[in-house]
């Protein structure tokens, strides 16, 4: 009897050793990332602005009135562009020295990027079973998330830029992902999205996802969450809230020069053309409406096909393309996008989606944005103008290809996982 059991015992021990070695590999990857991120104390300009905005609120100074600009050590004078509630939530950073604040925002971003990637993998039901790795599926997906995020942090432009600036785009993305991807949420679905909208209006585009899913409860919850959070901002910063919502919000030009090559959207592309403001605005509205129509068409088709994760990606890319400002570090959504379309491309034997996933990785690793000369964008030749919009072209391709090629046709792989989809209509 013992001789018969011995191979099973040895096999079990071997699997455990393999699992330990895999986590050792993940630890080495995270160690390398930490060395790259913390090997020296970098200056992250956006966390500096967050700190100064929080200090202004704590000191009772205006955040926006009179065209307030905050002076940075590198000579740039920048405004605080978020609602007053954000300054309130940034206040813990105000109590830290700049190096400590840089470390804090970097650690927070890294943890949330791993967590959000693991949630995306769970929503896709990636790696559901394994004969070699004796661990729950959630731990396997967490390990896989670490192995995905580690190189992305260093080598993929939107992700590395987000870390370099000390931005909160990953925080906002995580708030959306935890509301839209899981099958169930421990809070009323839409609550986290509403908080994200209160921190920065751009996540409001994800209301379209709930509306097309006919999940009115989640949409109303998001609106209620946004209203309560904004009201809290008025309670804690009445003058700044009034100034922001009645005046500052409408002046998108204060965010930065739209013609910069890193502004990856329709508005940025039009700003690089020598046309008048009225013509530029009309073209932006027309282009945005066309992209909206294409996105709704694509989302309806992929939702009918039972792929809500892809619908979330479509609306995320739509928001980036039509937003008045979409700096390249706002495009952190490209990471979950390549994961979703890559895995769905494999499951559905959809070569177009798989190739778009690969193209997305290539664009992030060797970005053509730099082919558009910085600060000389408006005089660049036509092919540089086109190449400099690479993220926009890729996003539009994903939306169109998703709508054209993802159908309700069942495959063996998909039939096994049809119940594992995010955001059911009832929370």
From Swiss-Prot:
Give the stretches traversing the membrane: 18-38, 101-121, 143-163, 191-211, 218-238, 279-299, 308-328, 331-346, 351-371, 386-406
- Listed GO CC annotations: plasma membrane
**EC annotation?**
2.4.1.-
Major enzyme class: transferase
* Protein location: Cell membrane
Function per UniProt: Responsible for the addition of alpha-(1-2) mannose branches to the linear mannan core on the biosynthetic pathway to mature lipoarabinomannan (LAM).
Task: Identify the InterPro entries for this entry.
Answer: GT87 (IPR018584)
Any idea which GO molecular function terms this record carries?
alpha-1,2-mannosyltransferase activity
The entry's protein name is: Polyprenol-phosphate-mannose-dependent alpha-(1-2)-phosphatidylinositol mannoside mannosyltransferase
Q: What is the lineage of its organism?
A: Bacteria, Bacillati, Actinomycetota, Actinomycetes, Mycobacteriales
Pathway membership, UniProt: Phospholipid metabolism; phosphatidylinositol metabolism
């Amino acid at each position: 009897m013992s001789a018969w059991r011995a191979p099973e015992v040895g096999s079990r021990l071997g699997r455990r050793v393999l699992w330990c070695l895999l986590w050792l590999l993940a630890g080495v990857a995270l160690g390398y990332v930490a060395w790259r991120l913390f090997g020296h104390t970098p200056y992250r300009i956006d966390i500096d602005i967050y700190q100064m905005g929080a200090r202004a609120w704590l000191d009772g100074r205006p955040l926006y009135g009179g065209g307030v600009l905050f002076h940075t050590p590198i000579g740039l004078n920048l405004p605080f562009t978020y609602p007053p509630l954000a300054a309130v939530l940034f206040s813990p950073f105000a109590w830290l020295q700049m190096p400590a604040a840089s470390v804090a925002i970097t650690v927070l971003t890294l943890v949330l990027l791993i967590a959000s990637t693991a949630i995306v993998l769970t929503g896709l039901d990636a790696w559901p079973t394994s004969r070699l790795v004796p661990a729950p599926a959630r731990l396997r997906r967490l390990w896989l998330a670490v192995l995905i995020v580690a190189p992305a942090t260093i080598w993929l432009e939107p992700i590395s830029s987000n870390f370099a600036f000390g931005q909160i785009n990953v925080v906002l993305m995580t708030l959306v992902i935890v509301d839209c991807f899981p099958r169930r949420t421990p809070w009323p679905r839409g609550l986290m999205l509403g908080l994200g909208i209160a921190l920065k209006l751009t996540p409001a585009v994800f209301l379209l996802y709930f509306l097309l899913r006919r999940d009115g409860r989640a949409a109303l919850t998001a609106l209620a969450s946004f209203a309560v959070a904004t009201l809290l901002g008025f309670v804690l910063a009445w003058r700044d809230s009034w100034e922001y919502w009645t005046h500052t919000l409408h002046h998108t030009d204060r965010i930065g020069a739209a013609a910069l090559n890193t502004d990856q959207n329709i508005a940025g592309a039009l700003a690089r053309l020598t046309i008048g403001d009225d013509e530029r605005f009309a073209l932006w509205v027309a282009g945005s409406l066309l992209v909206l129509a294409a996105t709704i068409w694509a989302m309806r088709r992929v939702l009918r096909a039972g792929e809500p994760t892809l619908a979330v990606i479509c609306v995320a890319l739509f928001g980036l393309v039509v937003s008045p400002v979409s700096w390249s570090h706002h495009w952190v959504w490209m990471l979950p996008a390549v994961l979703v379309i890559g895995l769905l491309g494999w499951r559905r034997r959809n070569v177009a989606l798989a190739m778009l996933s690969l193209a997305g990785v290539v664009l992030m690793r060797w970005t053509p944005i730099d082919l558009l000369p910085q600060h000389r964008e408006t005089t660049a030749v036509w092919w540089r103008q086109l190449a400099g919009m690479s993220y926009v072209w890729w996003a539009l391709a994903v939306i169109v290809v998703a709508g054209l090629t993802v159908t309700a046709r069942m495959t063996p792989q998909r039939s096994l996982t049809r119940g594992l989809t995010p955001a059911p209509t009832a929370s």
